[in-house]
């Protein structure tokens, strides 16, 4: 592959443009630099920025069918080989505090042995790990190592989020054992997060597996083995997601049963209260008809005696219900 001039890649509003020094570090790209396989370049762009969008649309370094994909058209994880280059779309956990983590961020990458072009709109939190390693001089030394480190960081963040969801399910199961029902919508949100993760992480696992099996010229055998390990690790995370989805279904049935039992218990209590007060209600209604005058109305102790009789009647009914084991 021919060398590339630094001036052909230096985009003014790029998030960053670095050259890998081959020793695990980076340096800012200069217009006078020469980009080749021994000194590859990583260009990271926000495709909504004006200069970045214009560069993506006009640069001759990218194949025509790659431009739209890097500009935000591709969202589902996939990998496509295009001559000497490879187009990769990946999804990662959203690290923004203003949005839910399951609203995944898309990152698109086109790379060959000398050039890495990655684009995004929202910040890709997992890239901070790779950037930190490069700034400390302990990062990848070539394009293949860069791709493996990025996929490893993405999988680490996905695994952490899956573990958080798993912990929430365990807490929810413990609360259900204590007859504590979660707030309305909590289980639905948890299930949605699991389903969204399953939807995007399954094809991403396939992307990793294909990268491990493809004989890409800029990936070594050791890097392919590492990529296969990453695919296997994400596969175990998907198995955990499937188990969690099944457990949320069981918990939904358990919550419905607990709510039904609580409703039945309240209905039963109200029925018993109605049974206790039914005789007293009948007597007060009968005396209140007042067609022939209220019995005992002219006696000064009439009302007191009537109240005592009502208390005795209510107590008798309650005692009968208790002995009948209804109370």
Swiss-Prot record:
CDD domains, per database record: ZntB-like_1 (cd12833)
UniProt keyword Cell division, yes or no: no
Membrane keyword on record: yes
Main location: membrane
Alphabetized UniProt keyword annotations: Cell inner membrane, Cell membrane, Ion transport, Membrane, Transmembrane, Transmembrane helix, Transport, Zinc
Cytoplasmic topology ranges: 1-272, 321-327
Catalyses which reaction(s): Zn(2+)(out) + H(+)(out) = Zn(2+)(in) + H(+)(in)
Bilayer topology: Multi-pass membrane protein
Residues on Periplasmic side: 289-302
GO cellular component: plasma membrane
Secretion signal span: none
GO biological process assignments: zinc ion import across plasma membrane; zinc ion transmembrane transport
Pfam families: CorA
Gene Ontology MF terms: cobalt ion binding; cobalt ion transmembrane transporter activity; magnesium ion binding; magnesium ion transmembrane transporter activity; solute:proton symporter activity; zinc efflux transmembrane transporter activity; zinc ion transmembrane transporter activity
InterPro entries membership: CorA_cytoplasmic_dom, CorA_TM1_TM2, MgTranspt_CorA/ZnTranspt_ZntB, Zn_transp_ZntB
Segments traversing the membrane: 273-288, 303-320
Subcellular localization, as worded in the UniProt entry: Cell inner membrane
Note: Uses a transport mechanism that does not resemble the one proposed for homologous CorA channels.
HAMAP family per the UniProt record, alphabetical: ZntB
Family, as annotated: Belongs to the CorA metal ion transporter (MIT) (TC 1.A.35) family.
PANTHER family: CORA FAMILY METAL ION TRANSPORTER (EUROFUNG), ZINC TRANSPORT PROTEIN ZNTB
Function: Zinc transporter. Acts as a Zn(2+):proton symporter, which likely mediates zinc ion uptake. Purified ZntB reconstituted in liposomes also binds and transports Cd(2+), Ni(2+) and Co(2+).
Subunit structure, as described in the record: Homopentamer.
Protein name (database record): Zinc transport protein ZntB
